Amino acid sequence: MMIKLIVNADDFGLTEGTNYGIIDGHINGLVNSTTMMMNMPGTEHAVRLAKEYKTLGVGVHLVLTAGKPLLGDVPSLVSSDGLFHKQSVVWEGKVNPEEVEREWTAQIEKFLSYGLKPTHLDSHHHVHGLPILHDVLERLAATYNVPIRRCEEERAVRPFSDLFYSDFYADGVTEDYFVKLKERVQGEQTVEIMVHPAYIDPELVKRSSYVMDRVKELRILTESELPEGIELVKF
């Protein structure tokens, strides 16, 4: 009875330091999957690394709450400064799903334009869990034939795991996290754990409120060994 584990590093492309942390977490640790942000300063750098390290599964980290959209004509998605709304505004559901679909399609198409094939889709700040975006996700999953990170809601769209844990984060980043995993999971289940390893650079400090713990995450991800009965799997 093996537990199948996907350790997905979010925010590939956010900054170069983030990218290097994710690659280190893959080569020397438990990270076997990542998702790329297509509108960030480190995106091009992440693309080069994705092509170099082919053993790392790479999907698209759909963005609605950080940086600038790729499209210019998405008024419901941006504040007066032309940047995406803060997540609090998005969670109020004040975005036009049609504009979200066009912007997210542009983000996926940009990923494909580099000759990369996405393993799956997820989103920054988990906004794909918004009920008003459910149908958008269904269409994107069907169009691009990819699974999508499980949401807590019952109507998860084409989820690729039985369980999704987002608690390896901040105070939840503990030395024994992976050892204790067996107590939380039944038998043959597939589990995705969301992680955020990085090396700190000035751009990360500027763009994220979650900084110091990313280095701690990287250390634990590279020092931990999986207990017997848990294996890393690909999509």
From Swiss-Prot:
Known cofactor(s): Mg(2+)
UniProt entry keywords in alphabetical sequence: Carbohydrate metabolism, Hydrolase, Magnesium, Metal-binding
Gene Ontology biological-process annotations: polysaccharide catabolic process
Enzyme Commission designation: 3.5.1.-
Annotated CDD domains: YdjC_EF3048_like (cd10803)
Cross-referenced InterPro entries: COD_ChbG_bac, Glyco_hydro/deAcase_b/a-brl, YdjC-like
Binding site for Mg(2+): H61, H124
SUPFAM superfamilies in alphabetical order: Glycoside hydrolase/deacetylase
Pfam families recorded: YdjC (PF04794)
Catalytic class of the enzyme: hydrolase
GO molecular function: deacetylase activity; hydrolase activity, acting on carbon-nitrogen (but not peptide) bonds, in linear amides; metal ion binding
Functional note: Probably catalyzes the deacetylation of acetylated carbohydrates an important step in the degradation of oligosaccharides.
PANTHER family named in the record: CARBOHYDRATE DEACETYLASE, YDJC DEACETYLASE FAMILY MEMBER
HAMAP family for the chain: COD
Protein family according to the UniProt entry: Belongs to the YdjC deacetylase family.
Name recorded for this polypeptide: Carbohydrate deacetylase
Organism (species): Bacillus cereus (strain 03BB102)
